[in-house]
Each structure stands twice: as structure tokens, then as C-alpha cells.
């Protein structure tokens, strides 16, 4: 089952957890790959179920964990307490904005 659908891409809860874990591990080590994770400022005004500061990290359609190069369109968003805020995508959004994944 899809825990999040970004455009036509289905992400399972385990894929989301793996991306969040990889992003949070880098965040907590004060490290990054290709400038991810970085602070997500929520200019779009999403009503996330957890409070921020938020960080974004790519979640890849291939199922691999992001290790650099092209981040693709989709992101997991988590806070500094390693709580998942949501999954967002550039797919279907204008310019460099994000929309929520279903």
C-alpha cells in the first residue's frame, strides 16, 4: 500500500522511513550529501502534524537511499526530533514550489 503518492509515484511507509532515517542521521551528525538535508522553511504554509524547525531530504523513486547527485522531485520533511512532518513534491507545483503528496 502507498503511504504517500507523489504524482504517480507510490512510496511505502518503509521507503519513507528509510529516507527519513538517512536524512536524520546526516542532520544529527551535522553532515550532508549534495547539501541535503537542509532547512525547509515551509514557504507553502503546510499544516504539518509536528512542529519545526523542519528539514528536507530527497526520497527517490528508484527505492535507493539518496547519496548525492540529482535529488529528483520528492522530499521527506522531518524535524530536529526525528519526527516525520510529511512527504512533499515539486511534481504538479509551479516553479520551485512544493505540493503535498497524497
Curated annotation (Swiss-Prot):
The keyword Nucleotide-binding does not apply. Keywords: Disulfide bond, Endonuclease, Hydrolase, Lyase, Nuclease. This is Guanyl-specific ribonuclease Pc. It comes from Penicillium chrysogenum. One of its GO terms (molecular function) is lyase activity. Belongs to the ribonuclease N1/T1 family. Pfam families: Ribonuclease. Disulfide bonds join 2-10, 6-101. Coiled coil: none annotated. Its EC number is 4.6.1.24. The keyword Transmembrane does not apply. It comes from the Eukaryota. The active site is at 38, 56 (proton acceptor), 90 (proton donor). It catalyses: [RNA] containing guanosine + H2O = an [RNA fragment]-3'-guanosine-3'-phosphate + a 5'-hydroxy-ribonucleotide-3'-[RNA fragment].
